[in-house]
């Protein structure tokens, strides 16, 4: 059985600029098909526009507000919103109010699968 507590996961900054606490991923558990992490962005912060060749992502907004951009389309997002980011889609999220959200990737997140403009 694999159980990870949020407080035991050390935050780090990913290649896209968000701060992450990785709950279950290739580095800390025997996951094979997906990964789960919590991301935070300060008010006014954003991820760098990027895409993943292999991973489909799901974001689930817990706190804050922002603007999600996927392949040139933008929409305001907030608590309770779930966002699908298809593999290969350029995307970026900007925090208009400090944000906290869950990220699920399938296959699991890997730095090597993150590409920038």
Where would I find each of the regions flagged by the language model?
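A short, N-terminal "cap"/entry segment at the start of jelly-roll beta-barrel domains
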Residues: 1-33, 48, 114-117
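A cytosolic small-molecule/anion-sensing beta-strand core signal
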Residues: 62-63, 78-79, 97
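Conserved short histidine dyad/triad with adjacent acidic residue
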Residues: 37-53
């Amino acid at each position: 059985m694999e159980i990870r507590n949020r407080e035991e996961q050390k935050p780090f900054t990913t290649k896209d600029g968000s701060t992450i606490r990785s709950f279950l991923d290739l580095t800390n558990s025997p996951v094979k098909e997906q990964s789960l992490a919590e991301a935070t962005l300060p008010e006014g912060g954003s991820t760098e526009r990027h895409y993943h060749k292999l991973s489909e992502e799901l974001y689930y907004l817990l706190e804050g507000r922002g603007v999600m951009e996927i392949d040139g389309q933008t929409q305001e997002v907030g608590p309770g919103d779930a966002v699908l980011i298809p593999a290969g889609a350029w995307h970026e999220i900007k925090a208009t109010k400090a944000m906290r959200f869950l990220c699920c990737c399938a296959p699991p997140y890997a730095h090597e699968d993150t590409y920038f403009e």
